């Protein structure tokens, strides 16, 4: 019988994901500016949805780029 280690979310479950926290949001996007999938980030489904909304809001407010074509 296999035992699976429970994955720990990189963001505590009670901590809000704010679109103004650019340093936090940058940890979950690629170098090209794409949102990383849940299997890579290790977030819960609810946190991943909140993260996607926060990143999209930050892009609209020009806090994050839509595309990062540098480098």
Swiss-Prot record:
Keywords attached to this entry: Ribonucleoprotein, Ribosomal protein, RNA-binding, rRNA-binding
A Pfam match: Ribosomal_S18
Entry annotated with the keyword Lyase: no
Disulfide bonds: none
GO cellular component terms attached to this protein's record: ribonucleoprotein complex; ribosome
Signal sequence coordinates: none
Gene Ontology biological-process annotations: translation
InterPro entries to which the protein is assigned, alphabetical: Ribosomal_bS18, Ribosomal_bS18_CS, Ribosomal_bS18_sf
Molecular function GO labels: small ribosomal subunit rRNA binding; structural constituent of ribosome
Physiological role: Binds as a heterodimer with protein bS6 to the central domain of the 16S rRNA, where it helps stabilize the platform of the 30S subunit.
Family membership noted in the UniProt record: Belongs to the bacterial ribosomal protein bS18 family.
Subunit structure: Part of the 30S ribosomal subunit. Forms a tight heterodimer with protein bS6.
PANTHER family: 30S RIBOSOMAL PROTEIN S18, SMALL RIBOSOMAL SUBUNIT PROTEIN BS18M
Protein name: Small ribosomal subunit protein bS18
Native organism: Thermosynechococcus vestitus (strain NIES-2133 / IAM M-273 / BP-1)
Lineage: Bacteria, Bacillati, Cyanobacteriota, Cyanophyceae, Acaryochloridales
Gene name in the database record: rpsR
